[in-house]
Amino acid sequence: MSEDDLMREVEKTKDRAMNAQAERTRYLGEFKERVIVALTKKQVAEDEMYIEVINAMKNKEATKMIFSREIPFSKIERYIKKAEQAQIQHKSVDGLLYFGDVGLIIVSDDALKVPVDNVFVTSISDKFSEKRLNQIYYQSFNKKICQFHLKVIREEMPEYKDEYQEISFVDKLFGMKCPICEKLGG
């Protein structure tokens, strides 16, 4: 091996080491090949829980949940409860050591058998936009809505059907109106 070849190998090794360290600082101290799913800090702070995180906790390779200490406990508490139910360890890490907007990850102890290309979850709001549903559908999470709009949710976004309830006859008697109908003029 010539001196030039040796220097190239040293440079490649150095680049790999630097990339690995940069990767770990982005993913809360973990290598990307161990990450099953990731949420941004903004997503963790939303009122709704992400189904993808709950499903990732059920993955046989999932061993722990790591979250940024910058996230208020009131927002991370529900994920901690789900992790405990799934018998997944959890820990918080100090945000000073890491850069980027990663707020929560579900990881394996080893590299995943089937690597995930994009570990980041699409925001719920963006999912509604992709289905061409008005943002009032998203804003009406955990509210009672009319039968028509509940049917739309069941057809277009079945994974979120349990986030809504149907307005009952009694609710209508007391003047309750569907927030989606009010916004869209239905």
Tell what function each PLM region has.
Residues 69-75:
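Acidic, metal-coordinating catalytic cores used for nucleic-acid/nucleotide bond scission
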Residues 58, 77-80, 84:
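Anion (oxyanion) recognition and catalysis
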Residues 58-65:
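Short, surface-exposed connector motifs at secondary-structure boundaries
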Residues 82-134:
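Short basic, glycine-rich beta-strand/loop surfaces that mediate nucleic-acid
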Residues 23, 48-53, 75:
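Well-ordered alpha-helical segments embedded in enzymatic catalytic cores
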Residues 3-4, 16, 115-148:
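Ser/Thr/Gly-rich flexible loops in soluble cytosolic domains mediating phosphotransfer, phosphorylation
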Residues 137-186:
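Charge-patterned, long linear interaction tracts outside catalytic cores
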